[in-house]
Amino acid sequence: MNDLKRMNIKELEDLCENMREQIIEVVGKNGGHLGPNLGVVELSIALHYVYNSPEDKIVWDVGHQSYVHKILTGRKDKFHTIRKKGGLGPFTDPNESVHDQFISGHAGNSLSAATGLAMANPDKDVIVIIGDAAFANGTTLEALNDINGKIKNLTIIINDNEMSIGENVGAISEVFNKVINSHFYLKLRKDVRKLLSRYHITKPIVKPTERLEQSLRSIVTPGGFFNILGYDYIGPM
């Protein structure tokens, strides 16, 4: 972990490549979840680069996305045993490592667990990684409503990969399906600012332009959904 924090960008990129190769090799032999883990390699490394686990709590909503997390937290030499009798489990498990906050299988309960961890550890950061499919889970929405943007040491990362075992349905799913529209918003904002700059139009309409920008942002990005609930939204990234 300390070695990770001393790496430069090139070394981190090489680490990502090595992680992918290791996961592909082991999953090819043992079975397991290949796509979900390959999709969070950079994210997992970034989290452990920035935060200090286990003091800071990293919570995975879907345990079978935690392969990189396992490798980075002292289980690299045992990774070849994953899903084998007596080997590493396929999900996070606090009995396996202090870096695992709770036993997680499939989707939905991470935000509730993370809320409790954040309240119990107000001087530490708690980070929860949850997918777009899991976000429509009832327990997730209950936790989202309960938090109401008031727990300041909790960061929610939505892995909007449009992947799930079954088809995502419902209004919440539709909100995340609109994320592509945010690229339209970003391009529109850039074009408007370029136009104003070209004609040297600045201060007289700064405030109206800012209000228009805020209105557009609330309409065409999923951030509006979270802003209404009291959260600071950054994205998409």
Predicted regions and their residues:
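Hydrophobic anchor at the start of a short beta-strand
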Residues: 126, 154, 233
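Short beta-alpha junction loops
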Residues: 133, 160-163
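Gly-rich Lys/Arg/Thr-decorated short loops/hinges at beta-loop-alpha junctions or inter-strand turns
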Residues: 1-3, 21-26, 88-100, 124, ...
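Generic structural signal for well-ordered, non-membrane alpha-helical segments
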Residues: 12-16, 36-40, 106, 110, ...
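Cofactor-binding active-site loop characterized by glycine-rich and histidine/acidic residues
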Residues: 33-150
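Long, well-ordered, tryptophan-enriched scaffold segments
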Residues: 162-237
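N-terminal amphipathic, basic-rich helices that act as targeting or association modules
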Residues: 1-73, 225-230, 237
